Amino acid sequence: MAFCRLPHLVVNSSPIRSAQTGVHEQLATLVARHADPTHPFRKPVTDYNLRAFDASLAAWRAAGEAPLILDTGCGVGLSTLHLAMRHPDHFVIGIDQSADRLARNTHWDGPQPTNLCFVRADLVDYWRLAHQAGLRPAQHYLLYPNPWPKIGHLARRWQGHPVFPFIVALGGRLECRSNWQIYVEEFTSALNHLTGGTFQTEAWRPEQPITPFERKYLASGHALWRCVADLDAGLAA
């Protein structure tokens, strides 16, 4: 089986530092506001993102519309490749807003899986378009998103962003990972607020890291955290 030889990484990653010591006190209010149908999120979708979304759907349909996995914020795409190898009966769409990251050498040894595509798109638009199109991904990953650790940056984190209800509405098995425990605790809290679920934050130590960040954080001795939620069943996975 093909495997990924990650590029050399200097082990000098510092833990996230923040004045915030727990779930943000404004999170519940913000999540409720964003879920309020009388205050819809009206940011226009750009033509570029619409074309990118349509192209990714065309690739999925051309591959037979296998059960879908979304790897959102996939960076250089290593996680997308790993997910495609691990789930050969699924189709994986790796989405990132940076053309530079998507174009980098991923150091993947052996043949690349064919059950995937990469698309450059803004996630805020992509998630809303996916919801509008009625997509129901089987699995949905947010791996090590930008933590925005300053207290005043809550609204920049996905759980504090107006797009969060669209992420949840897509359903499926949703997984978020981070090396900042508070980020995952907030993500979990926001999920529970929207769904009435009892999802949990858990410590996470993978047998094989699937992103450069995951490998770097592990090698630097960071604790890793994740939330896994089966949104269709309403139960923690």
Language model region names:
Residues 2-68, 78-85, 107-134:
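S-adenosyl-L-methionine
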Residues 183-190, 194-237:
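Class I S-adenosyl-L-methionine
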Residues 72, 95:
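Conserved beta-strand/loop positions that form the S-adenosyl-L-methionine
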Residues 73-77:
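Class I SAM-dependent methyltransferase "Motif I" SAM/SAH-binding loop
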Residues 170-178:
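Conserved beta-strand signature within the Rossmann-like core of class I S-adenosyl-L-methionine
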Residues 155-163:
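Charged helix-capping and loop-helix junction motifs
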Residues 98:
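Conserved SAM/SAH-binding beta-strand->alpha-helix loop
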